[in-house]
């Protein structure tokens, strides 16, 4: 992390707003050890200068100062017993960032990388993402440093289902009093899928003695929504479709590189294939799978079985028509491609990757993960005038469909797959159009980063002004 004074000078060069400079300086000073959170705040605030100058009431009401501070941060211990009878203790978190436009909404992440900085960055991004969906949802994020992929007592083995269940039950015991269908509605995220959501929901129901839509991403047998697992990946591709349409192009025949192999990456790949694109890669922590002739439906099914059933890594997989490249990300593994969809994790794509991609003719980058591009990479794409969408806009399909699940739970109804998919398409088009129009309105036409930040910010800021100092 660079020296604080150096970072402040860098920010002052980028921003022409004294208000933004002041808030950034204070935020950096108070959160000097939280690099992910500072990166997210810098990216948003430095793009808001035009709207702040046009609306002095935001500074008068200290909107930025309040927006960068969580309304509430909950940290709790999570004790559980492993299969050997040994007591283990992890740390649990929930960052309730902003509830100006609705109850807190955002996922839970179980991974050793989880800390307060990561969750504050994700919660901050979630505020704007949820605002962009046009649904009444505030922003939050939570999780734990628990690693379900590594047994605490057997190296190279995963936690058993029983261990994951006991951990989830303990985690919910620490969290349940702070959440509720009108207060805070968590969902899944990294390493929190249908199995974990089921265990968490069961424990909440037991503790609260009520069945409510307190979690989204539930199974279809107990209140879940069709399309929810697919929604983030599908939405990312729908957003890319809308970006290409502004230049009279489609995804038909485009060569696409996708990173990741979880739900976001897998379903982005599926939708790309359905729309006539050729998917060249998927990846995980062990390396990248390259599909020289394009990913097939059969190969994707094998990947999803490996990840969702066997819970293995690509290094273990033998597949005809696929080449495994160990310890490499996809960006420089393939030489010629048109579109990139980073769907793995934050800061996975750096400045060197971006330079390689630009040199080799990439036309579009659609973020499926949260903040997967470093500032250097993002700036390179913006300067080159690529079709580049920030995750808060292009991966909002997941939380949008969570909002649709909340609606179905409230009404005690279930929509068809076609109904949910149609609503998802409409929401992604609305997000695209709002970001595109906001950028054009403030003199940044085609800059989806600025457009998404402004469009997401204004709705929340106006609500905060209307509600007074709270």
Question: Model segments located where?
Answer:
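N-terminal ligand-binding/catalytic initiation module
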Residues: 2-226, 459-469
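Adenosine-phosphate binding glycine-rich loop
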Residues: 7, 11-40, 243, 358-470
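Conserved active-site and cofactor/substrate-binding residues in soluble primary-metabolism enzymes
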Residues: 18, 32-39, 43, 58, ...
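Structural signal for hydrophobic packing residues in well-ordered secondary-structure cores
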Residues: 27-31, 45-52, 56, 123-131, ...
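General beta-strand structural signal in soluble alpha/beta enzymes
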Residues: 121, 183-187, 211-215, 281-284, ...
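A short glycine/serine-rich beta->alpha loop
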Residues: 183-185, 221-228, 386-390, 444-446
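Glycine-rich phosphate/diphosphate-binding loop of Rossmann-like nucleotide-binding domains
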Residues: 216-219, 224-336
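Rossmann-like adenosine-cofactor binding region
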Residues: 287-388, 393
């Amino acid at each position: 992390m660079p020296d604080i004074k150096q970072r402040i000078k860098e920010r002052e060069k980028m921003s022409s707003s004294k208000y933004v400079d002041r808030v950034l300086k204070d935020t950096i000073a108070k959160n000097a050890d939280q690099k992910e959170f500072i990166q997210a705040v810098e990216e948003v605030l430095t793009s808001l200068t035009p709207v702040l100058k046009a609306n002095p009431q935001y500074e008068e009401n200290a909107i930025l100062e309040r927006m960068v501070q969580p309304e509430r941060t909950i940290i709790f211990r999570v004790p559980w017993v492993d299969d050997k009878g040994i007591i283990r203790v992890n740390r649990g978190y929930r960052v309730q960032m902003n509830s100006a436009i609705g109850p807190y909404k955002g996922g839970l992440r179980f991974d050793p990388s989880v800390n307060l900085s990561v969750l504050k960055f994700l919660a901050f991004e979630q505020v704007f993402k949820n605002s962009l969906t046009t649904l009444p949802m505030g922003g939050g994020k939570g999780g734990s440093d628990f690693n379900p992929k590594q047994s605490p007592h057997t190296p190279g083995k995963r936690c058993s289902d029983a261990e994951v269940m006991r951990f989830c039950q303990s985690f919910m015991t620490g969290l349940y009093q702070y959440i509720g269908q009108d207060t805070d509605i968590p969902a899944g995220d990294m390493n929190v899928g249908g199995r974990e959501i089921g265990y968490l929901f069961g424990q909440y129901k037991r503790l609260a003695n009520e069945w409510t839509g307190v979690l989204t991403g539930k199974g279809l047998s107990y209140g879940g929504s069709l399309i929810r697992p697919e929604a983030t990946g599908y939405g990312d591709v729908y957003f890319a479709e809308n970006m290409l349409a502004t230049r009279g192009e489609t995804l038909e025949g485009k060569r696409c590189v996708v990173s990741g192999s979880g739900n976001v990456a897998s379903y982005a790949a599926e939708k790309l294939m359905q729309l006539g694109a050729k998917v060249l890669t998927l990846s995980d922590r062990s390396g990248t799978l390259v599909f020289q002739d394009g990913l097939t439906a059969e190969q994707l099914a094998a990947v999803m079985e490996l990840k969702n059933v066997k819970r293995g890594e690509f290094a273990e997989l033998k597949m005809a028509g696929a080449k495994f490249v160990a310890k490499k990300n996809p960006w420089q593994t393939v030489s010629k491609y048109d579109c990139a969809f980073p769907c793995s994790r934050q800061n996975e794509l750096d400045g060197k990757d971006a330079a390689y991609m630009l040199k080799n003719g990439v036309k579009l980058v659609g973020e499926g993960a949260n903040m997967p591009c470093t500032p250097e990479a993002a700036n390179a794409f913006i300067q080159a005038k690529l079709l580049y969408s920030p995750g808060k806009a292009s991966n909002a399909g997941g939380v949008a469909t969570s909002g649709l699940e909340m609606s179905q739970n409230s009404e005690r109804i279930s929509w068809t797959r076609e109904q949910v998919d149609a609503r998802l398409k409409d929401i992604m088009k609305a997000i695209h159009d709002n970001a595109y129009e906001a950028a054009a309105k403030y003199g940044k036409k085609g800059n989806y980063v600025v457009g998404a930040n402004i469009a997401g910010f204004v709705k929340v800021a106006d609500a905060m002004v209307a509600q007074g100092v709270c």
